[in-house]
Amino acid sequence: MINAQEISALLKQQIEGFQPDFDYTETGVVTYIGDGIARAQGLDNAMSGELLVFENGTIGMAQNLETNDVGIIILGQFTDIREGSVVRRTGKIMEVPVGSALIGRVINPLGQPVDGLGEIRTSKTRPIEYPAPGVMQRKSVNEPLQTGLKAIDALVPIGRGQRELIIGDRQTGKTSVAIDAILNQKGQDMICIYVAIGQKESTVRTQVETLRQYGALDYTIVVTASASQPSPLLFLAPYAGVAMAEEFMYEGKHVLIVYDDLSKQAVAYRELSLLLRRPPGREAYPGDVFYLHSRLLERSAKVSDELGGGSITALPFIETQAGDISAYIATNVISITDGQIFLKDDLFNSGIRPAIDAGSSVSRVGGSAQIKAMKKVAGTLRIDLASYRELEAFTQFGSDLDAATQAKLNRGRRTVEVLKQPLHKPLPVEKQVLILYALTNGFLDSVPIDDILAFEEELYAYFDLHYDGLLDVIRTTKDLPDTDELNAAIQAFKDQSVFK
């Protein structure tokens, strides 16, 4: 029998031990919806860039924090969202899945697979916005990144950790340059990330199939926000890509990331900013469009040994109109990057591919990463090519030419021919050095221009068969072998070939 005092003590004990179980979430109400933008009132403590959830499960991101309401960009379909719909805070900044489980997959900027190969099994995530490495956390660029393209590796060399802009009109081969660079990373201990922004889905499919065909998908992640996707996804795609790259960089690995292209990201950001009623500036872009790209590209770096010594090399693309590199976005990105490769449509249409304009293209830091052998054979190539272009323009007047000028023109024509390269056929650096050595030492001066491609292919096959040791010296020591031996080998090839 329990007496009244025991009941009273028991009740008192339970009351004292009572823990109220409630879930506190700050919610707001949608006051406007349209064009992928929502405005909501009641989210007074929302953070900039915070993820918000609508009652139908759609995710949004807080962009404008105003006195009365919050401007939200919607990351998905917004047809089910109405005025009066409830939206709640999550207290989280946007993150994407990262790690080696993503390699070989095609995903959207939210980290969701779009290749039909099932879910991605990784528990690691990283925020898409993250501070770039500081000054003391970086190292100078000192390792080469071989693209496999003679015109780039000789004239505008790229180093690991560099940002090299690829700029040109549409249909000048920008994507082909980047895809070839990715193909050439096979066996180089490099992870590649291809970010397709605003591309046609059929085009992305073609690129993915090319990567798969050449075995490059084994070390590549494809992040795609196609032209049919809402603007917020196009805006976020590059940040998602670089967050995935950072995970590998801080593990001490090397990453090549391609942004194809940042012009479309800037247009998507302009669209969002105007819809959010932000004040427009030059060409109607918002005032912070420079920061849009600088905070992205500054995250590409060669980090110090204390942080693992990894690197992110970035190849951002900018599409120009009629070759105008003085446009707003083009000049912004040129000033952020460590050099640019300028592709010209008149070169492309005349059959010079890759259509690199050697005069306008520059690499500000890659030269220090170039291997010794390439420095020796390609040292004067840029100046020779520039002087050839001047002479060629001069000869349009039909003047009589002396022997020295004629020799320069002949060498220049052969240089242009040697720097041409078929699509998806990147070349190992030792073979690039071999053909450029043959060119700069006069072995091609007697070869007819139409036969240079055949000369090149037969020279590689001959060296693979008879002089693989010389190629191995270039490959391992990164320097030229004994020049007498190399001259004798090339002469032996010429003597037994039809190219006397």
Curated annotation (Swiss-Prot):
GO MF annotations in UniProt: ADP binding; ATP binding; proton-transporting ATP synthase activity, rotational mechanism
CC annotations in GO: plasma membrane; proton-transporting ATP synthase complex
Primary localization class, coarse: membrane
Topological type in the membrane: Peripheral membrane protein
Catalytic activity of the protein: ATP + H2O + 4 H(+)(in) = ADP + phosphate + 5 H(+)(out)
Keywords assigned: ATP synthesis, ATP-binding, Cell membrane, CF(1), Hydrogen ion transport, Ion transport, Membrane, Nucleotide-binding, Translocase, Transport
EC number per UniProt: 7.1.2.2
Subcellular location: Cell membrane
Organism superkingdom: Bacteria
Statement: the UniProt record of this protein carries the keyword Transferase: no
Binding site residues for ATP: G168, D169, R170, Q171, T172, G173, K174, T175
Site positions per UniProt: Required for activity: S361
Pfam family for this entry, one: ATP-synt_ab
Family: Belongs to the ATPase alpha/beta chains family.
Subunit description: F-type ATPases have 2 components, CF(1) - the catalytic core - and CF(0) - the membrane proton channel. CF(1) has five subunits: alpha(3), beta(3), gamma(1), delta(1), epsilon(1). CF(0) has three main subunits: a(1), b(2) and c(9-12). The alpha and beta chains form an alternating ring which encloses part of the gamma chain. CF(1) is attached to CF(0) by a central stalk formed by the gamma and epsilon chains, while a peripheral stalk is formed by the delta and b chains.
Task of the protein: Produces ATP from ADP in the presence of a proton gradient across the membrane. The alpha chain is a regulatory subunit.
NCBIfam families assigned: atpA, PRK13343.1
Descriptive protein name: ATP synthase subunit alpha
Organism for this UniProt entry: Streptococcus suis (strain 05ZYH33)
